[in-house]
Every structure is written in C-alpha cells, then in structure tokens.
Amino acid sequence: MNRKIGKGLMLTMVCIGTWLPAAAQGFRNDTIADRTHRLQGVTVTEERRQKTVRSTTPYHLMERGDFERLGVTDVADALHRIPGITLRDYGGAGGMKTVSVRGFGARHTGVCYDGVMLSNCQSGEIDISRYSIDNVGALALTIGDHEDIFIPARQASTPATLSIETMRMPSEDPRAHLTAQMKVGSFGLASPFVRYEQSVTRNLAIAAEAEYTYAENDYPFTLRNVTLVTKERRTHSRMNEGHGELNMSWRPTATTTVGAKAYYYDNDRQLPGMVRLYTNLSGENLRERNAFGQLTVRTQLTGKWLLRGIAKYNWAESVYKDELYAGGVNDASYWQREAYTSAALLYVADERWAMDYSADYAFNNLNGSSWRTVVGRPYRHTLLQSATVRYRDGRLTMLGRLLYSLYLNDAKEGPSARNMRRLSPSVSLSYRLLPERELYVRASYKNIFRSPTFNESYYYHYGSTDLAPEVTDQVNVGMTMEEGRMTKDEGLTVRVTLDGYYNRVRDMIVSVPYNMFVWSCVNVGKVRILGADATMNLRWRPRGGHEVMVTGNYSYQRAQNRTNPESPNYNKQIAYMPEHSWGAGVNYENPWVNVSINGHGVTARWPNNDHYAGTMIDGYKEFGLTAYRAFSWGRHRLEGRVDVKNLFNEQYELVGHYPMPGRSWQLSILYKI
C-alpha cells in the first residue's frame, strides 16, 4: 500500500472514529422519509414523503397502502410497477431475484435497508427475495441523486438506489401491538409471520419480528423440444427460509435519536436445474446465512448543524454443493465479512441553502473453502467522501455533489486487484413552470465509478485481477405534473411523469448465468443506452367509501454494444435487456370486497451478447387478480386476502431455461391488535 495513501486513510478513519462517539446522541436513520427540523433562527420544513413530481431526479415511491390496493405479493412484484427496472428471477418462492435499472446491471443498483446500504462484496448483487413484503412500510427507487442530501456517501455511489423502509414503530402509545399473519398457497407454500412492538416509555420503543417460509415449488411447465411437447414438473426446488429482526429506537433528548437493529437470515434451498433437452435434473443445494447489527445516531448539534453516524458489522455465508457433479460432489463455500462506519455533517444556512459532507469507511474480506473457489483470500479498504450543496426556493431546486472513491485492494496470497480512485460529479435541478400549478421540468447528470467485485477479480477461472472498472454517465431530462384534489368524501387526482435518458458505460462487465449460483463475466467495453420512462397514477373518489385507482408505467430502453464498429456484435442489444416493458393496475375499494387486477410484461430478450440463433427468450405478459376485505372492532383488526397470480397461465422465462410458475393462488389471513 502506498505510504501517502495509507496516511490519508488512517487520518480519515481517526476522524470518523472521533465523530461517532461524539454522536452517541443521534437519530434513527431514515432515508426515504424527510423530517421536519426546527433550528434556532430558521425553520426548515420538509414533507413526510417527498412528492415524486417535485424531485430533481426520477423518484418512485410505493407505500404500505399501495401494496394492499395494487395486489402486491412480494418485493419483486412491487418492482414490476416501477418503470426502468429489469428483474432476473429463477422462479418460485425464494428463488434468487436481482434488480437492474435502465440497463446498468444489478451491480449498479444499491439497496438501502432502513437507511443503511446492504453489501455483497462477493458478487455485488443484492438478492431482494430475502426481504419480506410483510415487514415493509415503503419502497422507493431513486435514479440519480436523492433530494435528501443528509445521507451516507455510499448511498450516493450508485446510479440507482432502492430504499426499503420497514414498518415504523409506535411513537407514544404504551400498549403492546401484535401482528400475526399466515399465508398458504400453491406448490406447497406456507409462510407464518409475527411482529411485536411496544413503546416501553415515551422515549424508548422496541420491535421484534420473525418469518418462516416453506415451499416445494414443484410447479408444472410445458417442455418444447423441436416437435416434441411434454408436460413436466419442476423438481429439486424446495426451500426453507427464515428471518428475524430486533429493532430499538431511543430518544434520549428532544433533538437526538438512537436506533439499533439486529438481523438474521437463513435459507436452505435446493437449486433447480436448467431445462435442457429432455431434463431439468439438478443436484445443487445452497444454504445462505446472513447476520448483521447496525447502530444509527442522529443529533442536532447547534442551531444549524446536524450530525449523523452509522456503525455496522455484517457477516454472510454461502455453502454450495452439487451432488451430481462429474467426478464426485462439488463443494464450494464462501464467507464474507464487512465492518462499516459512516459520518455525515449537515449545515442548513437558511431556508434555501443546505450543505452536507459525508465520509464512509468499509473493510471487506472474502475466503472460500478451496483453491477452486476464490483465489488469494482477498480483502479491501474502501473510503468514500461526498460534498453536497442544495439550493431550494419556491420554484427552483438545484443539487450538486462531488463524490471521491478510493479502493485499496490486497490479498493474503497471490496477486491482488489494482487500487482505484476517482472523483465523480453529479448535478440535478427541478423547476416549477407555473406558480399555481404542480407542473415541473427536471434535468440531471451523474457520473459513477464501480470497482469490480471479488468474484470478478478473484473467482477461479472466471475472475481477473486486471479487470477494468466500470465508469458510467447518466443524463436525464423529464417533465412531471399533478392535478386535482382529494377530500375525505370525493375528489380526483392525476399524476404523470415522463423522462428521457441517455446512459453510457465504459468497460461494462456483463454477467451471463452459467447456472443459478455461478456467473461468467464478459467485458463488453462500451455500452450506450437510450430510453424513456412514463408513469401515470389516477385516483377517483366518487363518494365516501368508494375509490378507484388506475396506475400504469411504460419503459423503452435500447442498450447497445458500442465497443467495436467492426465487430458483428456492434449495436446489438445487451443480454437480458428488453426493449419494451410495461405495467398496469386497476383497483376498486368499496364497502364490500376490494378488488384489484394488475398486469406487466416485456418484449423478447437475448440471453447472450452474441444473439445466437434459436436462443432468444420470448416476451411475455402476466396478469394477477386480488380480492381483500378488512374487519375492525375496537383495537382488533382482521384482514383476509386472496391472490391469483399468472391468471391466464402463461408460461414464460425471465432467465433462459428457467421456467416461471403458471397460474397459482395465495391465501392470507392477518390479525392485528
């Protein structure tokens, strides 16, 4: 390690370590919701939920009520309602699900869980199937920079961030609150969920939740092999999954909040094989465990200064076995660890100007069970620093940020990946065209640098320590509007957003699945992505007790290989990127039984960058139907719900040779007190 770099790193670590104890009177972190701060001499009032039409960058928000009204059954299902998202899904409950946004790839999508970024130094991809919709209070996708500048530097280090906010704890109600739910469904699905929460005192609240999911996932599918058509059933796809959380929120003073979380996840599952020719045989098994603890503190230091601190330790294990491997059992296990800390200092000069400085440090390491897994026992020091300025008056909002990224790579054995550093600028603005109308134009630019993951650098046979990092540029121009008003008894509101974008990736690393656990990496070089996203949300309340909601979204993205004009792959669409995708939903709430119908679909995709003849994955469209009703008496509430997914039993694939389930049903009973 360079001596000058080492001194700078140690100095920054000392500064962060000094700030965190000083902030032992901090706030519970919350990146989706803006807060209201009363400062000496100035009052800064921000909305509880930032309106999507006012954001300087594309910002899509779904809250708990939206999940119920739109028939959302899991996090992946919710993301189908957001434009610009591409999901990779291996099918069935508990199947691995990853998210890419606007053609950038899943490694460029950050996932934030209750204000702290999740990490996976091995693959760089976050499996969103781990996070139960039953415990989620809100989902938000930010493409570019969020208008809330008081965030960790890591949260600004990706082109897009998916924020998951869990259910909020009670504030001053001293009574215990209990939620119990049971889900059963097709293909052996059974999933109980329980949550207990209570405000022990006016300043201390605790919550605990636990969930277990079992599924056979033995759904039928049709196998077509040239002229032969047979009815088959998915095999070797069983899963046992459980997760638990403990949460605490403590307010020692009027201006200080401390939050703590302990999290554990365990999934023991069989991995179904690729459907090839006449078989989908598989002997692969994977057990994944993840545990982390995090502490967040937030406090108002003086009239205009606020401080936030985060400390987190994360541990993850993946134990993979293939009992049908040629020559004997193939055993590949991995263990990764991360120590992470962050400090952010916010200065609110007045009602218009605000400035933030954030510094994050992380240490990651990874080791495998044998020399055939990860070579060299790599580790990495990461230092991220961001400086942000925001200006906001009645009609104009402007935001500028400069992010400094430093990655120091090493390995206990053998060669290591090179060290990397970069300055990444971003700027965005939103302007209200008419003072009396919610009509806005917005524009943004963001440059981001992504270091290769440990798999990309060190994986046996697939990784390379000489692999070039990815550099991305994204430009967005859009218009948003919202009209109408809503009262308790009647009203009509319409919200529309339209964004066009240009993205560029240099030295793009594209992952193509070799099987469900191992991916091969191909360095494409240059990629150009042109696209457009549109959303519409209409709410009509003709009279009390009746409401109709209509939602829709559409995405166009042309993600082209632009590396070499002489190559036969020049201008070809990148693997797994559909050119067109859409989603829609209609909900009718009434005094009897609420009903929702929804649908989504994509056009054809290629599973490889070479577009080999006969490998194209057909497009698909899927529809779902939901009926639900709630009954309340006193403090008690009982909810019943029936979901039918893939209503017309269409067979399709999101990942090549991994068929998705056909028509299925799910019954949920929930009790609250």
Model-found features: residue ranges?
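C-terminal beta-signal and adjacent terminal beta-strands/loops
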Residues: 550, 601-608, 616-618, 627-673
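N-terminal periplasmic "start-of-domain" segments of outer-membrane beta-barrel proteins
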Residues: 38-68
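Extracytoplasmic beta-strand/coil segments of soluble accessory domains associated
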Residues: 76-117
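Flexible loop and strand-edge segments within Gram-negative outer membrane beta-barrel domains
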Residues: 27-28, 217-221, 230-242, 249-340, ...
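A beta-strand signature from Gram-negative outer-membrane beta-barrel systems
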Residues: 133-179
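Structural signature of Gram-negative outer-membrane beta-barrels, strongest in the C-terminal barrel
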Residues: 348-362, 367-503
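Membrane-embedded beta-barrel scaffold of Gram-negative outer-membrane proteins
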Residues: 304-320, 363, 441-444, 470-530, ...
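Gram-negative outer-membrane beta-barrel transporters
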Residues: 395-398, 495-504, 523-608, 637
